[in-house]
Amino acid sequence: AAPRSPYRHLELCGIANKITDYSNIAVSRCLKGYDGMTKILFVCHGNICRSPMAEYVMKDLVRQSGREDEFVIASAATSREELGNPVYPPVRRKLAEHGIRCDGHAARQMTRKDYEEFGYLIGMDRMNLSNMARICGGDPEGKCSLLLAHAGQSGDVADPWYTGDFEATWQDVNIGCRALLKELTEKK
C-alpha cells in the first residue's frame, strides 16, 4: 500500500526536489505506487520562479482542502540553465509571505518520461508549451495546458525573471491553481 503522503514518500526515496542524473528515473519508480492519484507537473523555463511557485501554492491549497492523499504535485524546467538551483530568493520570500515553504527544491529538467507519469502537464506560457511538446514528442493525449486557461484566461503567467513583479506572478499563479484544483476536484 502507498504511504499516506506522496510527498513524504518521495522524501523517503531520497529524491524529492533533488537533481541528480538518476532523479527522473527515481521519480518514475516512486510514482508507480500512486496510480490512482492525480499527478500534476508544473513547468516553466528554469524551474526556479513560476513552476515551483505553482507547485508549492498547489500543494498548500491541496493541504488546506484535506486532499493530500489524492494528489502528487511536482515541477520542472524546459531548459537546463538552472539545474540544481533552489527557488529564486524573491519567489521564496513571496511564498513565505503567505506561510508557504519551499525548502529543498532543486531545479530539474522535464523529460519525455514525465509525459507518461503525469496526468496534467501545466505550462506557464506559450513558449513553455511549445518546448514541452518538443521534449515529449508532441501531446497526443492532450495532457499539456496553460495554467491560466484553467481560470478561463488566455494569457501567460507573468514571468518575474523579466518583469521583476513577483506580486503579479503570485496573483496569476494563485488564480490558476485555485481554478485548476476546483476543476480537478469537481471531476472526482
Residue ranges and their predicted role:
Residues 120, 126-188:
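Phosphate-binding/catalytic loops
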Residues 2-9:
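Extreme N-terminal basic, low-complexity initiation segments
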Residues 16-36:
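Short, Lys/Arg-enriched N-terminal segments with co-localized hydrophobic residues
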Residues 12:
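Cationic, low-complexity basic patches in intrinsically disordered or flexible, solvent-exposed regions
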Residues 31-117, 182-188:
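Conserved active-site segments centered on acidic
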